[in-house]
Amino acid sequence: MATVADSGTARPSSIDHSGEGALARLGLRFTNLAENWFPDAYVFVCLAVTVVAAFAMLNGAAPMAVAKSFGDGFWSLITFTMQMAIVAIGGYVVASSPPAAKLIDGLAAMPRSGAGAVAFVAAVSMLTSLLSWGLSLIFSGLLVRVLARRADLRMDYRAAGAAAYLGLGATWALGLSSSSAQLQANAASLPKSVLQITGVIPFSETIFPWQSLVIALVLISISIVLARLSAPSSVTAVTAQMMDVDLEQTQVAQLPGRKRPGEWLEYSPLLTLIVVALGGGWIVQEFASKDPILAISNLNTYNLLFLMLGMLLHWRPRSFLNAVAKAVPATAGVLIQFPLYGGIA
């Protein structure tokens, strides 16, 4: 494969950003700072454990008592950890389904400029994050790849990638998959020590009050404007091609042909329809018998809804299973960090 240098295209590091606006230059400085100095989120969790343990001992707690408290709480969030992992998987399988790919293709045709495309990605990322942070992360990332294929946009790939994370970085905590709101709304997921203090706090008091909705609207509006203003111009934009990003990979992998009789059910929608009918029937009863806000605040109901939708959109069990296999690595942070949060609690 020809390198960037071989093709005669400038490398990102050689781009002159002196013509950019003050906001764009500030964004580039913060980008360089974050890339060079910020460690993985796991490191921050370990630092939090260290700081909390140190302050506990400074307040007179014996080291072995601190260790016992940490160990006793380590698995207190295990149910919630599994639930949040399913949130990531459910969002991924829905976003990577064939119908979602067609929707992404349609959305990618809408922007008319590179900077406009960055702002558009920011809007899509934040709006979808109100439904699911897992859906937002994958859907927006796939949208960036499709937009990057449009040579007429000359979109800055770095800015678009950052915009795709705005849902996870700015608004997801105001949406249905908010870990804090979901945790407080589900008594079975809360550690007993926390439940005794706070009790159960439903979505009607966290996500759906008018104050929260206004905050979400203002935050989304300001973030879209900032994404538009901070995006590099078409002259200085670093495109995906300049970064040697492979854009030929398709969003939805084609299923290989059946090679053995045992694969027939994996490629048939029969079992999908049966399972979705059962799950969908339960979901309909749940929403019919309860306040919709109360029903969706149940994390098990929320996860079942996304899994059933993912199964239906993928249609064939093999396609669904392939999507789940690709989604599992995205749960690594949840699986290893949440027990540490439990140890702190």
Where are these regions (language model features)?
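Aromatic-anchored segments of alpha-helical transmembrane domains
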Residues: 54, 126-130, 166-173, 279-284
